[in-house]
């Protein structure tokens, strides 16, 4: 079974760069406090690094 991580949106996407909004959508996040469980892959880690200031990651 692949390792998973929990990603929670902690800040609003309003007023952010369009690419950063699209990255949140790509991660499956919709609103503040929303948590998703994703596979721990390099692609997902790269998306998280792009919007690190808006999300919280739990292993």
Curated annotation (Swiss-Prot):
InterPro entries membership: Ribo_uL30_ferredoxin-like_sf, Ribosomal_uL30_bac-type, Ribosomal_uL30_CS, Ribosomal_uL30_ferredoxin-like
Tell me, what is an example of a GO biological process annotation in this record?
Answer: translation
Q: What parts of the sequence cross the membrane?
A: none
Question: A Gene Ontology molecular-function term?
Answer: structural constituent of ribosome
Q: Which GO terms describe its cellular component?
A: cytosolic large ribosomal subunit
Per the record's keyword annotation, is Ribonucleoprotein included, yes or no? yes
Q: Which CDD domains match?
A: Ribosomal_L30
This protein's UniProt keywords: Ribonucleoprotein, Ribosomal protein
SUPFAM superfamilies named in the record: Ribosomal protein L30p/L7e
Name the protein family: Belongs to the universal ribosomal protein uL30 family.
Q: What is annotated about its quaternary structure and interactions?
A: Part of the 50S ribosomal subunit.
Enumerate the HAMAP family for this protein: Ribosomal_uL30_B (MF_01371_B)
| Name the record gives this protein | Large ribosomal subunit protein uL30
| Organism of origin | Shewanella amazonensis (strain ATCC BAA-1098 / SB2B)
Encoding gene, per UniProt annotation: rpmD
């Amino acid at each position: 079974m692949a390792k998973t991580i929990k990603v929670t949106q902690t800040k609003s996407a309003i007023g952010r760069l369009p690419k950063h909004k699209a990255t949140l959508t790509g991660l499956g996040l919709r609103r503040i406090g929303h948590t998703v469980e994703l596979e721990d892959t390099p692609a997902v880690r790269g998306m998280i690094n792009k919007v690190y200031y808006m999300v919280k990651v739990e292993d």
